[in-house]
A protein has these predicted regions:
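Flavin-dependent oxidoreductase catalytic cores
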Residues: 1-392, 396, 400-407, 411-412, ...
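Rossmann-like dinucleotide-binding cores of NAD(P)H-dependent redox enzymes
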Residues: 411-451, 527-571, 629
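Short, structured coil segments at secondary-structure junctions
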Residues: 251, 290, 313-314, 451, ...
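Surface-exposed acidic, glycine/proline-enriched linker/cap segments
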Residues: 196-197, 371-385, 438-439, 500-512, ...
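Conserved acidic residues
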Residues: 54, 167, 253, 316, ...
Length: 648
């Protein structure tokens, strides 16, 4: 049997789960301003339960009306409206055979005053928070009365969770939030009974857990999410976290092992530059030291990896959250042996980026995530009646458009001038740490085959070719043309473009290389070239990678710095000569010369407006997706396919 353990039932306390797959908590931010759920949020969790997940732990849920909120629309479980609201989520999850725990949360020093009626954040000690890319918050030190009050509120929140129909609660004691701030010497500088020794630092959490256990029913599950490592100097390392787990074991039914705090944010929610399963030793060590079940999050991207980790004793249950953002049916598809149809998380951080921007939780490769009440299949306008639609371009945007149009009843035909599908994503997949993009292309190709979508490779979409098809509509998803700067020397033999590098048409060793353009692609090309070369990234803006989400940017820039890549900002390319580049300082206009044996242009793409106009002149209905629409990211490509092909 391929999945001997992954789809085997398992128990936490006296509660049996149908399999070992857990959707661990993540900020979905689909609630309302009263801390209550919304139809979109209910649908979000219901779809994952319907997809086969065994246990769902919704996003962090506030225990206090007056403090600890980390977002103005964070869910709460402290009043009667919220209890009734959570009943809807619990009923939806139970309806499809999954179980649900509510994660109890207080932000402590991470709770902005703006989200808490202007009130100052409170924490074990007056220690500034430290966040990658975010301003600091100075909390006040909690009094004993504050501690006593919050213990009561955690206990009441657990009681409310049981009233709402949940199967258990998880106290959030990780990620630099309040309870973890008590646990870690990095943030706990107290000298009373709540600080100093490990036992004292655990006292707040022990009081919460014992209070909850005394207040809820016997079979109601009580667990804790803990760190396996804080990954900050002065914090708890793996050995310390293991001792904490051993000390807390008598008070919990399970542990959910994660890692990191806001000062080490790239370890909490890892971008693609961290390999799958990189943190597995954290959970494995803690599991070996305790006798209660352990859930572990390990940036799982493949069900096969989840099975292997269960076999290796890394954990008893597997957290697969971002995996289920990308594809809510990952469990069903794996059980059916259709792994080829699973859209797997890229680690692109679009989900976190959307939440930080104040939007619903969205996924770059699944535009329905966070938009299911609008773009769910039950809302499809099936007016195609078999009419033909020409889709120009076989990248992710084009394939997404074709898939949607097929579901709407049209007959899409993809025209791709190259001998393969994938478009510019093929280039992206060649950069270091971007293998998941290649897997996405293969998955989308499998979808084209599964839905019997006609694909014409090596077929440029000229006006004449398209006219021969007599299409009802033309969808243009052909991407853009690379930007070539109008400068002296741009046509010299030592000037190359990103496809020359990433497709390995050329290779360099021992060269002084200037990469012109410090956007995402430019930085990744620099990463690609940094072995055995001296690489300099040249960017005209004040910073590089400004469109990259902050934790991914931090991680990528760290990798480049470790590899000796130089970053030169506020300089624009002015010319290329033999063995050098001429750069213009953007502040003074002065031109300086820098040595460069090789020059790589990584300035991005722009839509081909002349081709677009030809199509508009020739056909009545023409819509644009992806780069042909406005340029941008994978998320732009797939979402624009829905936005522009949902109805016409």
């Amino acid at each position: 049997m391929k999945y001997e353990k992954l789809f085997q039932p398992g128990k936490i306390g006296n509660l049996e789960l149908r399999n070992r797959v857990v959707m661990t908590a993540m900020g979905a931010l689909m609630g309302d301003w009263n801390g209550c759920t919304t139809p979109e949020q209910i649908r979000f969790y219901e779809d994952r339960a319907k997809g086969g997940c065994g246990l769902i732990i919704p996003e962090f849920t506030s225990v206090d009306a007056d403090s600890g909120h980390c977002n103005p629309i964070q869910l709460g479980i402290y009043d009667s409206r919220q209890i009734k609201s959570f009943q809807l989520i619990c009923e939806a999850v139970h309806r499809h055979g999954a179980k649900i725990f509510i994660q109890l949360h207080h932000g402590g020093r991470e709770a902005p005053p703006a989200c808490n009626g202007g009130r100052q954040a409170m924490a074990p000690s007056m220690e500034l928070n430290s966040v990658v890319g975010r301003a600091t918050i100075l909390p006040r030190e909690m009094t004993i009365e504050d501690i006593d009050n919050l213990v009561e509120k955690y206990v009441q929140a657990a009681v409310n969770s049981e009233l709402a129909g949940a199967d258990g609660v998880e106290v959030h004691a990780a990620h630099g939030y309040l309870v973890q701030q008590f646990l870690s010497p990095y943030t706990n500088k107290r000298t009373d009974e709540y600080g100093g020794s490990m036992e004292n630092r655990c006292r707040f959490l022990v009081r919460i857990l014992t209070g909850i256990r005394a207040a809820v029913s016997r079979d109601f599950v009580v667990g804790a999410r803990i760190n396996g490592n804080d990954f900050v100097e002065g914090g708890n390392d793996l050995a310390a976290c293991t001792e904490i787990a051993k000390y807390l074991e008598p008070y919990v039914d399970y542990f959910n092992v994660s890692c990191g705090v806001y000062a080490s944010a790239p370890t909490m929610i890892e971008p693609c530059y961290s390999p799958e399963g990189w943190r597995k030793d954290l959970a494995k060590t803690i599991k070996a030291a305790v006798h209660v079940p352990v859930i572990a999050v390990n940036t799982i991207k493949h069900p096969e990896t989840a099975e292997r980790f269960l076999q290796e004793g890394v954990s008893d249950f597997v957290g697969m959250s971002r995996m289920q953002l990308a594809d809510p049916e990952v469990v069903k598809k794996a059980m059916a042996g259709r792994e080829d149809l699973i859209r797997k998380c890229l680690g692109c951080m679009n989900c976190n980026k959307s939440v930080v921007a104040g939007k619903n939780l969205h996924c770059a490769i699944n535009p329905v995530t966070g938009r299911a009440t609008v773009y769910g299949d039950e809302n499809l306008v099936k007016t195609g009646a078999g009419r033909t639609v020409a889709v120009v371009g076989g990248g992710p945007g084009g394939m997404q458009a074709a898939l949607l149009l097929k579901k709407r009843g049209y007959y899409p035909v993809i025209f791709e001038s190259r001998d393969h599908l994938g478009g510019s994503a093929v280039l992206a997949s060649k950069a270091p740490c971007k293998g998941m993009v290649a897997e996405l292309i293969e998955t989308m190709k499998a979808e084209m085959k599964e839905y019997h979508i006609e694909v014409r490779l090596n077929t440029p979409a000229t006006v004449e070719t398209l006219r021969a098809l007599d299409p009802y509509c033309v969808v243009v998803a052909c991407g853009g043309d690379q930007i070539v700067p109008n400068i002296p020397g741009v046509d010299r033999s030592n000037v190359y473009y990103i496809e020359d590098v990433l497709l390995r048409r050329v290779s360099f060793e021992g060269k002084n290389i200037a990469v012109i353009g410090g956007g995402h692609v430019g930085l990744e090309v620099a990463h690609f070239l940094c072995d055995n070369n001296k690489v300099t990234v040249v960017e005209m803006q004040k910073e590089v990678g400004v469109t990259i989400y902050r934790t991914a940017r931090y991680k990528l820039l760290s990798l480049l710095a470790e590899s000796g890549v130089e970053v030169l900002t506020e300089h624009a390319i002015a010319g290329v000569t033999d063995g050098a580049v001429e750069l213009r300082k953007t502040d003074t206009g002065a031109v300086v010369t820098r040595p460069a044996d090789i020059v790589i242009m990584a300035l991005g793409n722009r839509p081909d407006k002349s081709y677009e106009q030809q199509l508009k002149d020739a056909f009545d209905k023409v819509v644009f997706v992806g780069d042909a629409n406005k340029g941008g990211t994978m998320a732009d490509a797939t979402l624009s396919a829905y936005e522009n092909c949902w109805f016409f």
